[in-house]
Amino acid sequence: MENRLKAKYENEIRPALIEKFNYSSVMQAPKIDKIVLNMGVGDATTNSKNLDEAVEELGLISGQKPLITKAKKSIAGFRLREGMSIGAKVTLRGERMYDFLDKLVNVALPRVRDFHGVSNKAFDGRGNYTLGIHEQLIFPEIDYDKVNRVRGLDVVIVTTAQTDEESRELLAQLGMPFAK
C-alpha cells in the first residue's frame, strides 16, 4: 500500500513546485531526504533507567530501533565523561519517513496545547527545517499512564531544497501548519 503523503507529493506537489519555481527537470524539484529524531537525555548520567525509557518511547514514536548517542568529550560541570550514553536518535527514510511526517502533521501537532502553528524561522539556510517538541505525549503511541517523565525531542526534516523558500513551500504543501 503506497503512502498517502508520498502519492500526494508525486501527483500534486512536485508538479506545482516545478511550475512555481520554473525547474527544467523533475529531479530539480525539492523532496524530503530524511527525518532525524533526537532525544537528549541529560539525566542519564545519574540514572541509566531514564535512557532505557527514552529509547523505548523513541522506538514507539518512530517505528524503528533508536541508536544510542554517546558524549564526545568530558564536561566536569555536567558530571559527564567521554563515551557516556546521553541520548538516542533515529533516522527515518522512505516509507517510514512519510508515515511519520503524516502522523506528525495530522495527529501529533494538533494535540499540542495552545498550538498556533510551527515557527517560520526554524530553517537553517540550506532548506532544512528543525522543530522542537516539548512533550512526547502528543504522539498517539505513547500511553499517558506509563510515562513517568515528560521528555522533549528534536525533529529535523532534511530536504533537497537549495533555499529556505523552496523548502518552506514544500513543507507547507505537505501540510505543515506554519504560524501566520
UniProtKB/Swiss-Prot annotation:
<keyword id="KW-0687">Ribonucleoprotein</keyword>
<dbReference type="GO" id="GO:0006412">
    <property type="term" value="P:translation"/>
</dbReference>
<dbReference type="InterPro" id="IPR031309">
    <property type="entry name" value="Ribosomal_uL5_C"/>
</dbReference>
<comment type="similarity">
    <text>Belongs to the universal ribosomal protein uL5 family.</text>
</comment>
<dbReference type="Pfam" id="PF00281">
    <property type="entry name" value="Ribosomal_L5"/>
</dbReference>
<dbReference type="GO" id="GO:0000049">
    <property type="term" value="F:tRNA binding"/>
</dbReference>
<comment type="subunit">
    <text>Part of the 50S ribosomal subunit; part of the 5S rRNA/L5/L18/L25 subcomplex. Contacts the 5S rRNA and the P site tRNA. Forms a bridge to the 30S subunit in the 70S ribosome.</text>
</comment>
<keyword id="KW-0820">tRNA-binding</keyword>
<dbReference type="InterPro" id="IPR031310">
    <property type="entry name" value="Ribosomal_uL5_N"/>
</dbReference>
<keyword id="KW-0689">Ribosomal protein</keyword>
<protein>
    <recommendedName>
        <fullName>Large ribosomal subunit protein uL5</fullName>
    </recommendedName>
</protein>
<dbReference type="InterPro" id="IPR002132">
    <property type="entry name" value="Ribosomal_uL5"/>
</dbReference>
<dbReference type="GO" id="GO:0003735">
    <property type="term" value="F:structural constituent of ribosome"/>
</dbReference>
<dbReference type="InterPro" id="IPR022803">
    <property type="entry name" value="Ribosomal_uL5_dom_sf"/>
</dbReference>
<dbReference type="InterPro" id="IPR020930">
    <property type="entry name" value="Ribosomal_uL5_bac-type"/>
</dbReference>
<keyword id="KW-0699">rRNA-binding</keyword>
<dbReference type="GO" id="GO:0019843">
    <property type="term" value="F:rRNA binding"/>
</dbReference>
<keyword id="KW-0694">RNA-binding</keyword>
<dbReference type="Pfam" id="PF00673">
    <property type="entry name" value="Ribosomal_L5_C"/>
</dbReference>
<comment type="function">
    <text>This is one of the proteins that bind and probably mediate the attachment of the 5S RNA into the large ribosomal subunit, where it forms part of the central protuberance. In the 70S ribosome it contacts protein S13 of the 30S subunit (bridge B1b), connecting the 2 subunits; this bridge is implicated in subunit movement. Contacts the P site tRNA; the 5S rRNA and some of its associated proteins might help stabilize positioning of ribosome-bound tRNAs.</text>
</comment>
<dbReference type="GO" id="GO:1990904">
    <property type="term" value="C:ribonucleoprotein complex"/>
</dbReference>
<dbReference type="InterPro" id="IPR020929">
    <property type="entry name" value="Ribosomal_uL5_CS"/>
</dbReference>
<dbReference type="GO" id="GO:0005840">
    <property type="term" value="C:ribosome"/>
</dbReference>
